Amino acid sequence: MISGIRVNDNCVTEFNNMKIRKTCGWIIFVIQNCEIIIHSKGASTTLTELVQSIDKNNEIQCAYVVFDAVSKIHFFMYARESSNSRDRMTYASSKQAILKKIEGVNVLTSVIESAQDVADLK
């Protein structure tokens, strides 16, 4: 927790529910008031569709996303191209805090800025 940002316990609970009980297909985490919290979660979709929906939501500038791709759980930091560098640095320096709390991530991608980045992964 180098950045001073702590992970809300609900993040771990919901991640474990997604991983074990398959209660949702994805979770978006954001930093609010020096704490990582759940912004939203939803049913299964494709990774491209998920990132496209984040792209359309102007409320989200930066976030952490976990995505259950059936056989693997993906984790990535989302940072809109237009997001300010301070937010990007805060999210980058706090990433290890959440990764230490949520166990079972199989695929770790550094930063995704748009749906096009997901297409480039394939």
Swiss-Prot record:
Pfam families in the cross-refs: Cofilin_ADF (PF00241)
Stored Gene3D superfamilies: Severin
InterPro entries assigned to the protein according to its UniProt record, in alphabetical order: ADF-H, ADF-H/Gelsolin-like_dom_sf, ADF/Cofilin
GO MF annotations in UniProt: actin monomer binding
Cell location: Cytoplasm; Cytoplasm, Cytoskeleton
Subunit annotation: Interacts with monomeric actin, does not bind to actin polymers.
PANTHER family per UniProt: COFILIN-RELATED
Family: Belongs to the actin-binding proteins ADF family.
Protein name per UniProt: Cofilin/actin-depolymerizing factor homolog 1
